[in-house]
Amino acid sequence: MLCLTRLRANVNKVAFMEMVKDLRFRTEAPIAECGAALKETHGDVEKAMEVLRKKGAARAMKKRSRVTEHGSVVACVGGLFGAAVITVCSETDFAARSAQFQNTCARVKVALQRKIIDSKGDVLTNPTEAHRSLVEATAEDIRSSIAVLGENVTIKSVESLRLAPHVAEHISIGSYTHGSLDVPDVGRIAGVVAVSRLDPTKEVQASTLTDVARHFVASSGAEGNYAHQNFFGTEETVGQWLKRHGLCFSSSLVVDFGKEPITHTASQPRNAVKHPEG
């Protein structure tokens, strides 16, 4: 009889641990909290998930005032409609390098991409409004990340790529991220670039756009006219390289985490005709 009782106890323990494992997989909450939530709800996994969600939201509210000085920048390209760089912050570098944080950044990028495409780029005309809208759209995801990481996570800013008005047709947009931890478009430095196709019937290879964005990331601290710089890894100037690839530069945006954005915009041609007003 005693052996049978012990056997049942062991079976119940194994079943309980399986439920804890399942709950942790579904919520990413700490094991101890999963166990406590299951005991509180008498083994009801769905109710336990709700308990963990409420506790996570409560902790998130308490942590929102904490200073966030670490994090990543995220390159976000919304098809042909525009691009931006998002800055997402955490309290510690340890959290910023975690898979949870990095994957949260990737989901934030997808949320902004949808907004760019759905609005045909209009959302980027006002970066402050774009930031507010993105924070609102990802609030639940950010709260979940705070609950898992145990520290504050914030979307600090959205910087928009602005096209040169006189080079705004037949545009292709590319991006490059430096210092990535295996999550695409998330890293320490992110750059987005817009170029115009000299022959609108020809498409630009994705690798070519990446090369252009990589150049501006690599030379973001350089002084002088970008067109006269050597293109990254070549003996050609930027202007020569772009011309050989049938491209005309419009604009670039590079954000190094924690630093001011660096932008370049194509200069207005000196011989451009100015039409009198009125």
Curated annotation (Swiss-Prot):
Sorted UniProt keywords: Elongation factor, Mitochondrion, Protein biosynthesis
Principal subcellular localization: mitochondrion
InterPro entries in the cross-refs: EF-Ts_dimer_sf (IPR036402), Transl_elong_EFTs/EF1B (IPR001816), Transl_elong_EFTs/EF1B_dimer (IPR014039), UBA-like_sf (IPR009060)
Molecular function GO terms recorded: translation elongation factor activity
Keyword Ubl conjugation tagged: no
UniProt key word Mitochondrion: yes
UniProt similarity note: Belongs to the EF-Ts family.
Family annotation (PANTHER family): ELONGATION FACTOR TS (PTHR11741), ELONGATION FACTOR TS, MITOCHONDRIAL (PTHR11741:SF0)
Extra remark beyond the main annotation: This protein may be expected to contain an N-terminal transit peptide but none has been predicted.
Protein name: Elongation factor Ts 1, mitochondrial
